[in-house]
């Protein structure tokens, strides 16, 4: 089934139910979360498939008053917004490069997006380490070999004693670094001045230069939010300066790396390996996608935050924003000019 409708109109008259549409809930997870009760008094439609077709989306959202997005899965651009006369609110979490904020403001549509400044995504931290260990110990390759009727196919590498480079020492980067220390790795960090200051304060090594960071790390894990200023922040020169035995891990956003440069760098042998959870365009359904067919790459389908526990944390924020908006006290407003009526 592509979608489900839930009409829980409140008989008490305490609130005015809103027409809420939730997108891209691939596994029909959200209605089973404890936090779903927060919107139980509203008229909720959940779509389990994905579409980026403007005509399809306009038809689906024609009566929608509050639109719920799961991260950046669906782009909300001017051509779509102009066809949604009933839309009052977009509620989501984290950054919003997939939304035309200025057009939302011009059309009187409020964007509320919690930036979750305090708690890191521990689910993403866990996946990052799953990818690091899988890459170092060649776990997917060993399993594929075993399924083919063969025994051990190669010798892996231990992480203990090797150097872990954290690019972006924020909430997630800090948690990844803590586990690196627990594994007995030598942890170093690079990034903006804020990252470097936090790293130094925590006793994390900061190399003398960016070049040294890339040249000396055995594993580099990226933990930077995607903004216009960080797009392409990892350059071909950075990648080319890595060891041929090194592994690059990206559970952040693919456009942090210069477009097309990762595949070229891997083909050139520096770095020697990569483990990625994010892609330039998602979802990736083309089996000919270059990274999927490289023997020195491990790929997962952007599942860093995809756990029941993380979903409940995220959708608690998202639903709280809807409840607050409906009560006339919006929170986490990205475009406050809508509130001002400008």
What is each PLM-predicted segment?
Residues 142-175, 184, 203-204:
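Glycine-rich NAD(P)-binding loop of Rossmann-like domains
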Residues 17, 87, 160-163, 236, ...:
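Phosphate-coordination loops involved in phosphoryl transfer and adenosine-cofactor binding
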Residues 125-144, 178-185, 315-329:
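Oxidoreductase and adenylate-handling cofactor-binding alpha/beta cores
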Residues 3-66, 70-71, 184, 326, ...:
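N-terminal glycine-/charge-rich "phosphate-binding" loop or analogous flexible N-terminal tail
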Residues 64-143, 157:
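Phosphate/diphosphate ligand-binding glycine-rich loop within oxidoreductases
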Residues 59-62, 75-79, 193-289:
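Rossmann-like adenosine-cofactor binding region
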Residues 111, 244-342:
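Rossmann-like dinucleotide-binding domain for NAD(H)/NADP(H)
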């Amino acid at each position: 089934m592509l979608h489900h409708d839930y009409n829980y109109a409140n008989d008490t008259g305490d609130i005015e139910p809103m027409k809420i549409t939730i997108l891209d809930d691939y596994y029909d997870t959200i209605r089973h979360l404890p936090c779903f009760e927060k919107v139980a008094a509203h008229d909720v439609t959940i779509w389990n498939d994905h579409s980026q077709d403007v005509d399809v989306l306009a038809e689906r959202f024609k009566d929608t008053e509050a639109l719920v997005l799961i991260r950046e899965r669906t782009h909300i651009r001017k051509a779509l917004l102009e066809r949604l006369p009933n839309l009052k609110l977009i509620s989501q979490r984290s950054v919003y490069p997939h939304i035309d904020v200025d057009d939302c403001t011009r059309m009187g549509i409020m964007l509320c997006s919690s930036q979750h400044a305090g708690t890191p995504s521990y689910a993403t931290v866990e996946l990052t380490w799953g990818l690091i260990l899988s890459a170092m110990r060649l776990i997917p390759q060993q399993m594929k070999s075993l399924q083919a009727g063969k025994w051990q196919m190669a010798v892996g590498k231990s992480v203990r004693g090797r150097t872990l480079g954290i690019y972006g020492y924020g909430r997630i980067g800090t948690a990844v670094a803590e586990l690196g220390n627990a594994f007995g790795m030598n942890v170093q960090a690079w990034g903006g001045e804020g990252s470097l200051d936090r790293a130094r304060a925590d006793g994390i090594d900061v190399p003398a230069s960016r070049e040294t960071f890339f040249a000396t790390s055995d594993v580099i894990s990226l933990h930077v939010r995607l903004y216009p200023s960080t797009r392409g922040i990892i350059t071909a020169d950075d990648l080319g300066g890595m060891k041929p035995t090194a592994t690059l891990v990206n559970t952040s956003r693919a456009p942090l790396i210069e477009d097309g440069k990762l595949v070229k760098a891997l083909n050139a042998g520096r770095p020697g390996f990569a483990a990625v959870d994010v892609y330039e365009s998602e979802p990736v359904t083309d089996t000919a996608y270059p990274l999927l067919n490289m023997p020195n790459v491990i790929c997962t389908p952007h599942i860093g935050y995809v756990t029941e526990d993380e979903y409940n944390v995220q959708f608690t924020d998202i639903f709280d924003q809807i409840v607050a908006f409906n009560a006339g006290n919006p929170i986490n407003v990205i475009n406050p000019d809508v509130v001002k009526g400008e």
